[in-house]
Amino acid sequence: MSVISANPWLMLLAIFVINVAYVTCLTVRTILTLKGYRYVAAAVSFIEVLIYIIGLGLVMANLDKFQNIIAYALGFSVGIIVGMKIEEKLALGYSVVNVTTANYELDLPTQLRNLGYGVTHFPAYGRDGERLVMQILTPRRFELKLMDTIKQIDEKAFVIAYEARTLHGGFWVKGVRSKKLKAYDTDEI
């Protein structure tokens, strides 16, 4: 640590990097906790606290330099963004995608089932007449692929996606057909 303390630029860099690492862990741990991954969250929190103690120690030992506090705050901000990007890549959990279409001829439910998605569909009535409504549950990592697939098949479909909090019964209890979902390319539709 004496090498870092002797060089003010190294000190700034160390404080910044340590705080980015700390807040990244903090953000990921919070998201893991909210999604119910409590044991993984506990392991991440152990690493988080170790990093926090080191970073805070560096700042507290050098409070007389305002730039160190700025580096700490910037590291905090960047850490939030990095943590959120990591969570996006992990894509934990499931999404419910609701699709409303007026085009019955496309037989969208059958096409999506053939691609491995579980689809529940039913008739509905909107301002402009009869519609077909579909409810599709998909792992979050396939949400964008599903949205692209729907746009390829029916570009006028009305689509809403939201996070599913609790699952019980139905298609997903039998097992996700992830291999089938991964196997197709949206350009081939």
Curated annotation (Swiss-Prot):
Keywords: Cell membrane, Membrane, Transmembrane, Transmembrane helix. Its main location: membrane. It is found in: Cell membrane. The keyword Transmembrane helix applies. The chain crosses the membrane at residues 8-28, 40-60, 66-86. GO terms for cellular component: plasma membrane. Belongs to the UPF0316 family. This is UPF0316 protein Sca_1484. It comes from Staphylococcus carnosus (strain TM300). The lineage of its organism: Bacteria, Bacillati, Bacillota, Bacilli, Bacillales.
